Regions:
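Glycine-rich phosphate-binding loops of nucleotide-dependent enzymes
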Residues: 1-186
Length: 186
């Protein structure tokens, strides 16, 4: 877990790790090797995914479109394979996120979901793309107590999936039960 007060640089660090910003000094190591991450696409190819505090979802779009935004499944000619995206999105909703209610389908729009459900979609997307490292930027921000507990259970479950996570927050109570190690940014 990476903990620090507002303005300590937590979100900036996330953006360096995920390729949004290039560092002005220092080094980034991943899997024991020094790396230079020049873009979001490169960090994704390396196996790094991010779940941002704003969740990076499009409210007006259906869940299947949100899950595959920017990484659509296409055929050899570049045409979208909508049926396959919908089928894979159903798997993600059921198997990765645990949505079993018929009220939430791949055609549901994000704006109709609760904060925790939106966070679940963002988590499912990060797991589907076979990430080795999931960077979580204040994933419990603005969530109810029950939704926060679901998020914390998800983070705890990453160990069972042999995934690593950087859980960034300013609330030590949220990260205490989910993290193995703590770094405090001051």
């Amino acid at each position: 877990a990476l903990i620090g007060d507002n303005g300590a640089g937590k979100s900036t660090l996330i953006k360096v790790i995920t390729g949004v910003h290039r560092p002005t000094s220092g080094q980034v190591s991943f899997k024991g090797e020094q790396v230079v991450i020049k873009s979001v696409a490169q960090s994704r190819k390396m196996g790094i995914e991010a779940v941002y505090q704003e969740r990076a979802l499009c409210d007006q779009q259906e869940l299947y479109r949100n899950i595959f935004a920017g990484r659509e499944i296409t055929n050899a000619f570049g045409f979208l394979k909508i049926k396959e995206q919908r089928k894979e999105a159903e798997k993600i909703l059921r198997d990765y996120i645990g949505f079993t209610s018929k009220a939430i389908t791949v055609d549901s729009t994000v704006m109709g979901l609760s904060g925790g459900e939106k966070q679940g979609v963002a988590f499912g997307r990060s797991l589907y793309f076979n990430s080795d490292l999931i960077v979580l930027d204040e994933p419990t921000m603005g969530l109810s107590i029950q939704e926060t507990e679901k998020v914390l259970n998800f983070v705890r479950g990453l160990k069972d999936e042999n995934k690593s996570a950087i859980f960034i927050d300013h609330n030590i109570i949220h990260v205490y039960g989910a993290a193995d190690r703590f770094i405090i940014l001051d």
